[in-house]
């Protein structure tokens, strides 16, 4: 059996792996930065500072798909970025910052993810995007957020958005049990699995959007992440959901799996 990488090293890798030295944009494409997705006059200074998004808009194309991307970092760190592997591929990318622990606690992270997604539904047509082709994705903590707002209807319903209108859910190695940081807030150790209303697994349902679960190698992933996702796949099937898929990227650990997962994400989108 392959040696499990340490939790600390894996988390550090998540936080630094996406630093982009330069982003090569195609002519006539655009990268718009630091757009607030809450009301601009919000009285909360942390919301004004943190709750921003960037948009990459592809060149010379209309009614394009849009990937809403949530970064990883354990709900305690990380920074928005537009993945370079998604640039100039005929899709828009909306990269989202959300509030982090310890400045906030659950469910603030999910509230922000829902608010940003609602902003995209209401605004992406202005940039040429198709509201019927909005994909919610993210790595690690970002994958957890993607599943929570896609499976638990209440978060987007607060913005009068129906979560079933999401085109695809594509989490990269996301917790399907209650997130370890949420468990820590409640005094539960990260080695103690918990499934409650803050777990994607709690919200398994037949009529959810199509769900593509991508993980790294089961022997290299952190804290049983492959097995969590495999159980999610099984229970969605048991619930009667016809479009749940599970992909294991052999040879890649929790941090490394994101790079090949981006290519898989593009393939999934273009095969629809």
Question: What residue ranges belong to the model's regions?
Answer:
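N-terminal cap/lid segment of alpha/beta-hydrolase-fold proteins
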Residues: 23-61
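Short beta-strand element of the alpha/beta-hydrolase
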Residues: 63-72
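Short amphipathic alpha-helix adjacent to the substrate-entry channel of hydrolases
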Residues: 79-96
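Alpha/beta-hydrolase active-site loop
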Residues: 105-125
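Primarily recognizes the serine-hydrolase "nucleophile elbow" in alpha/beta-hydrolase
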Residues: 121-184, 196
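The feature captures the conserved acid-bearing segment of alpha/beta-hydrolase catalytic domains
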Residues: 160-164, 168, 174-182, 191-230, ...
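C-terminal catalytic histidine-bearing segment of alpha/beta-hydrolase fold enzymes
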Residues: 214, 230, 237-272
């Amino acid at each position: 059996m392959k040696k499990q990488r340490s939790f600390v090293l894996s988390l550090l890798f998540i936080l630094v792996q996406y630093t982009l030295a330069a982003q090569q944009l195609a002519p006539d494409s655009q990268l718009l930065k630091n757009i607030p997705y809450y009301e601009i006059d919000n009285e909360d200074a942390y919301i004004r500072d943190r709750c921003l998004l960037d948009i990459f808009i592809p060149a010379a194309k209309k009614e394009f798909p849009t990937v809403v991307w949530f970064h990883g970092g354990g709900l305690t760190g990380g920074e928005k970025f537009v993945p370079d592997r998604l640039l100039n591929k005929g899709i828009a990318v909306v990269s989202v910052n959300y509030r982090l622990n310890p400045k906030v606690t659950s469910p603030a992270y999910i509230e922000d993810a829902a608010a940003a997604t609602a902003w995209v539904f209401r605004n992406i047509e202005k940039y040429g995007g198709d509201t019927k082709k909005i994909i919610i994705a993210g790595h690690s903590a970002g994958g957890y957020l993607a599943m929570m707002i896609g499976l638990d209807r209440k978060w987007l319903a607060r913005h009068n958005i129906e979560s079933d209108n999401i085109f695809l859910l594509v989490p990269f190695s996301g917790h399907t049990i209650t997130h370890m940081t949420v468990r820590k807030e409640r005094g539960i150790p990260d080695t103690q699995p918990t499934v409650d209303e803050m777990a994607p697994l709690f919200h398994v349902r037949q009529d959810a959007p199509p769900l593509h679960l991508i993980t790294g190698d089961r022997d290299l992933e952190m804290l049983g992440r492959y097995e969590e996702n495999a159980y999610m796949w099984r229970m969605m099937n048991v619930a009667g959901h016809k479009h749940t898929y599970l992909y294991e990227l052999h040879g890649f650990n929790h941090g490394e799996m994101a790079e090949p997962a981006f290519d898989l994400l593009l393939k999934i989108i273009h095969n629809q």
